[in-house]
């Protein structure tokens, strides 16, 4: 019997993790939030600040992979995901995600590149983050396009206690890796502010895979009264990523330079019978790419440049007109687009292949929830109408119910539609472009059962899903020429199991498993995914042993190449409770020294070590 099988059986039989990752059956306050999580009959997982801090990671994506069943992210090396050709960081939920079908948000503000429509994986860092809410299944009712397969809402940290608090962390490790982070928060009366910064750099596990990232975050909040709150958020990132290509097709001098920024201003209200708010936001980027060249070939004489943006506002309100009832309604507007061009390497003033375009979208939605028999049963239904300057109208229905027939039990049944609008590249850029494309869409059917035992110390859940996708945008040969068409379709189905068990004050265990069946082979969508974790916290020490096992992961489709692997990671920390608490930490990943690939031709590192220190004040 393999080590992974023994470890999985141990974790599942004892059942599983801990308090720090929770599948929410109840409300979570999001700031700003369009609605309560409890109003959604979907499968929602929250990753809180304790989980994020204990991971010792600076990117949110690997934390999500470990803690969310059914979610998978591609990686091409030790650090950094990149953009352009050969990039990684594709996020799939239940096999849906390629082509930006999972929407990332920061405090409810959508994040994506305006021209190519892709997400921005290197910018999703732990710096300044309080928690992450992951919705598995369509979130298009609330967020519209790009939330077809699900949504990831990154909630930033807010100072809640009067005084000045902060932390500083430094870590060093394999491949000359250095990670530094500092944050501080202040609150005095009605005013609060948080400022944080992060710098990561590494030489990478392959020659030519160097990576550098800097992130700056600022949040200011003012409680104008007991019922009104206003705030401003600003988040900036700069990345330099080198890409050596694949082992089959190596590249020289391939690099990307990104400057990304996002800012928002909001006002929220909260009264006894209604709450809501308004938020205006802008997300922008400046990108420069050298696509590199093969050894022995002639270097390219130009650089690719682009600027992009998406900006808009959202207005939302929830009212409680009578007992156990909630009615939520809102309006969203977004203006997005960008500008691409090539510049000569010798004379940057020479431009070629220029492209510029934009689109506008406006939407309104309403959602109603009614609790019956003292909330033994809650019925939920909603609809969204989205209008685009390109594709016209798109209706998005969603319905479901939540039942609590026994103490500690929850049953969810849901139906929902998700969609993704074509991006500017698919519509207007390059040879296959087709300005007449319509949105991709899918219908999701889901049942979730959850039961708590032993006064909540044991939490077990299972979810079953069926996904029917239509009008996928694919490139077809029409009259001898490539053309993007709404021709693809897919069926995904499967189930997920997760369990958490707090044994006592020192011991806790957890596991989650997902099974995915697809009617066609898909990259970055493993058929079987298992994560299991054991936590031991005696006194001021803390030890975590974590297993990740993947079976039947397609890394290439022609020729067909599959990857199976088991990873074992170890984390240890010791806290000195002085006037200023100091935590010494070490983490060792892939301690079995497995050789594996997630992206074809991009070998992942063997054993890696990181050590560091954190101060809190």
Question: What does each model-identified segment do?
Answer:
Residues 468-470, 552-554, 572-617:
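C-terminal beta-signal and adjacent terminal beta-strands/loops
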Residues 202-209, 213, 227-310:
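Flexible loop and strand-edge segments within Gram-negative outer membrane beta-barrel domains
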Residues 372-373, 466-468, 485-555, 583, ...:
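Gram-negative outer-membrane beta-barrel transporters
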Residues 247-266, 270, 306, 357-359, ...:
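Outer-membrane beta-barrel signature, preferentially recognizing the C-terminal barrel domain
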Residues 92, 109-136:
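Short acidic/polar hinge/loop motifs at secondary-structure boundaries
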């Amino acid at each position: 019997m393999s080590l992974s099988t023994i470890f999985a059986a141990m974790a599942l039989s004892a059942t599983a993790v801990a308090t720090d990752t929770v599948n929410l059956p109840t409300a979570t306050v999001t700031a700003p939030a369009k609605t309560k999580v409890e109003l959604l009959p979907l499968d929602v997982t929250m990753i809180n600040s304790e989980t994020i801090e204990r991971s010792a990671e600076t990117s949110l994506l690997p934390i999500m992979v470990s803690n969310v069943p059914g979610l998978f992210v591609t990686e091409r090396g030790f650090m950094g995901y990149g953009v352009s050709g050969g990039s990684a960081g594709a996020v799939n939920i239940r096999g849906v995600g390629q082509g930006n079908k999972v929407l990332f948000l920061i405090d409810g503000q959508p994040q994506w590149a305006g021209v190519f429509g892709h997400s921005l994986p290197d910018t999703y860092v732990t710096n300044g983050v309080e928690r992450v809410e992951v919705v598995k299944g369509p979130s298009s009712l609330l967020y519209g396009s790009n939330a077809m397969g699900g949504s990831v809402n990154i909630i930033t940290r807010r100072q809640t206690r009067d005084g000045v608090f902060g932390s500083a962390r430094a870590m060093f490790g394999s491949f000359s890796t250095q990670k530094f982070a500092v944050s501080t928060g202040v609150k005095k009366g009605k005013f609060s502010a948080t400022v944080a910064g992060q710098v990561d750099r590494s030489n990478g596990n392959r020659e030519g895979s160097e990576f550098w990232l800097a992130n700056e975050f600022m949040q200011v909040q003012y409680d104008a009264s007991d019922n009104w709150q206003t705030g401003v958020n600003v988040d900036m990132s700069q990345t330099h990523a080198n890409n050596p290509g694949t082992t089959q097709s190596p590249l020289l001098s391939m690099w990307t330079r990104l400057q990304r920024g996002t800012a928002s201003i909001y006002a929220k209200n909260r009264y006894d019978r209604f709450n809501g708010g308004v938020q205006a936001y802008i997300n922008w980027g400046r990108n420069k790419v050298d696509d590199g060249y093969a050894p022995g070939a002639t270097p390219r004489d130009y650089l690719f440049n682009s600027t992009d943006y998406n900006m808009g506002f959202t207005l939302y309100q929830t009212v409680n007109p009578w007992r156990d009832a909630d009615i939520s309604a809102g309006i969203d507007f977004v203006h997005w687009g960008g500008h691409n061009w090539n510049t000569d390497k010798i004379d940057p003033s020479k431009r070629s292949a220029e492209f510029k375009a934009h689109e506008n979208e406006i939407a309104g939605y309403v959602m109603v929830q009614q609790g019956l028999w003292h909330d033994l049963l809650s019925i939920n239904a909603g609809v969204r109408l989205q209008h685009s300057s390109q594709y016209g109208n798109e209706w998005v229905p969603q319905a479901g119910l939540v039942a609590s027939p026994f103490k500690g039990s929850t049953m969810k049944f849901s139906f929902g539609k998700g969609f993704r609008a074509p991006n500017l590249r698919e519509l207007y850029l390059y040879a296959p472009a087709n300005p007449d494309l319509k949105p991709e869409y899918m219908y999701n059917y889901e049942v979730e059962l959850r039961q708590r035992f032993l006064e909540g110390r044991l939490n077990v859940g299972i979810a079953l899903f069926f996904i029917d996708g239509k009008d996928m945008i694919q490139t077809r040969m029409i009259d001898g020429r490539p053309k993007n068409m709404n021709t693809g379709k897919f069926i995904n189905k499967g189930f997920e199991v997760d369990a958490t068990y707090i044994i006592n004050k020192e011991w806790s265990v957890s596991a989650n498993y997902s099974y995915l069946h697809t009617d066609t082979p898909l990259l970055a969508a493993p058929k079987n995914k298992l994560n299991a974790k054991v936590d031991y916290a005696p006194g001021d020490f803390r030890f975590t042993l974590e297993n990740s096992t993947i079976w039947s992961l397609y890394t290439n489709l022609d020729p067909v190449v599959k990857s199976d692997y088991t990873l074992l990671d170890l984390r240890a920390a010791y806290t000195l409770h002085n006037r200023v608490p100091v935590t010494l930490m070490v983490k060792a990943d892939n301690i079995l020294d497995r050789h594996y690939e997630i992206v074809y031709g991009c070998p992942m590192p063997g054993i890696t070590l990181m050590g560091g220190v954190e101060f809190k004040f």
